[in-house]
């Protein structure tokens, strides 16, 4: 779920680039919808299977592994209002497996928000996907829910895996968020 502080951060960053945005885990879709309205000339890509990962049970009242129907319905309604939203209803793992070099070039993504599967494996997959999408460009990757053990552990591995690409790291956007600026190759 895109918090307003994170949305405002991306709003400022996207003004500075010709590249597009990608969100992993849209929940109700409000953040993606707002970005799409604010940036009608940009493509706003997103992926979400609408399956409860066990970390939002208190908010969703849905058991782990079950479909998040109300979130799905809300997101699809909002996405229908913006022709620049390109939504993929699948897991980020499946999306990454099927991602082609041609799609990476066509998507032209430089900014990625990771708020999907909050497990270590899920967050790890998501940073690999983010780096593939950014490719050789400069970019920004924002992780949400960094206080969750799986996400925090994945971030530590991310930092060890890509030290030459990470040009800065900061935590000032939101207490549960970490921002990484990615340098070009």
Regions found by a protein language model. Give the residues of each.
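S-adenosylmethionine/decaboxylated-SAM
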Residues: 7-185
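Conserved SAM-binding loop and adjacent beta-strand
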Residues: 1-6
């Amino acid at each position: 779920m895109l918090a307003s502080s994170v949305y405002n951060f991306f709003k400022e960053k996207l003004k500075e680039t010709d590249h597009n945005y990608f969100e992993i885990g849209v929940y109700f879709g409000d953040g993606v919808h707002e970005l799409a309205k604010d940036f009608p000339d940009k493509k706003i890509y997103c992926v979400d299977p609408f399956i409860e990962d066990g970390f939002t049970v208190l908010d969703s009242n849905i058991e782990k592994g079950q479909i998040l129907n109300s979130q799905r319905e809300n997101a699809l309604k909002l996405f229908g209002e913006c022709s620049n939203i390109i939504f993929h209803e699948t897991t980020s793992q499946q999306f990454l497996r099927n991602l082609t070099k041609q799609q990476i070039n066509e998507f032209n993504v430089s900014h990625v928000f990771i708020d999907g599967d909050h497990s270590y494996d899920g967050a790890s997959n998501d940073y690999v996907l983010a780096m593939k999408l950014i490719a050789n460009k400069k970019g920004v990757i924002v992780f949400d829910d960094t206080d969750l053990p799986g996400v925090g552990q994945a971030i530590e591995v991310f930092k060890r895996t890509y030290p030459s690409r990470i040009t800065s790291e900061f935590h000032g956007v939101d207490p549960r968020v970490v921002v990484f600026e990615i340098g070009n190759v």
